[in-house]
Design a protein with these regions (language model features):
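RecA-like P-loop NTPase motor core of helicase/translocase proteins
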Residues: 1-196
């Protein structure tokens, strides 16, 4: 999904979660973000849109930020039948060697289980926010360890070599025409693929 900056990418993928739950019953989602700052912004978006979506869908999403010191959240994520979202920044699962992350370790305080195994058993839907900042080769391999049902990638600027199955594209002109942005400035025009 390609959406112009400032047009509601986070809102759109939260609504997508509700729709996927409503239509197919899917309830496990992991939002992968490139940085702590974006992670905090995404968390805030979940907070401020919670009542709005509860009104529309008559249910709430249970969301949390992955924290290797609060592993009970992962158990709750796996066992709860409601819509559950874990927000995680790529650094939390993307180190190896002596810096190996706790998500891959058998932990005494987690009944000698590995957090990644519990998450993978849920076959979550991965939502990657700004994939061009997240999807290096090592990260792509690590993402597979979540055993996702499928992956949705949301960005304003997908890299040309990493566009897979584009299902929606909201470019600057369309965003302006839909009154999603106040003003655009055009230096030159070149139209590339549209899903309209």
């Amino acid at each position: 999904v390609e959406m112009e900056t400032g047009t509601g990418k986070t809102y759109t993928y939260i609504k997508t979660m509700f729709e996927l739950n409503k239509r197919y019953g899917w309830s496990k989602f992991i939002v992968v973000v490139p940085s702590v700052a974006i992670r905090e912004g995404v968390y805030k978006s979940f907070q401020i849109t919670q009542d709005h979506f509860a009104e529309e869908y008559n249910k709430k999403i249970r969301f949390f930020i992955y924290n290797s010191a609060q592993l009970t959240e992962i158990d709750r994520f796996a066992s709860d039948s409601a819509i559950n979202v874990m927000i995680i920044n790529s650094q939390a699962f993307n180190a190896t060697g002596k810096d190996a992350r706790r998500i891959y370790m058998k932990l005494d305080e987690f009944r000698s289980r590995r957090p990644i195994d519990i998450l993978a058993k849920t076959n979550p839907i991965l939502i990657i926010d700004e994939p061009q900042s997240v999807e290096g080769e090592k990260t792509k391999l690590r993402l597979k360890e979540f055993h996702p049902l499928f992956t949705l990638r949301y960005s304003a600027t997908h890299r040309k070599d990493s566009i897979y199955n584009m299902i929606y594209r909201l470019d600057a002109m369309e965003a302006y025409n839909k009154k999603l942005v106040k003003k655009i400035e055009v230096k030159g025009i070149s139209v590339s693929g549209s899903t309209a």
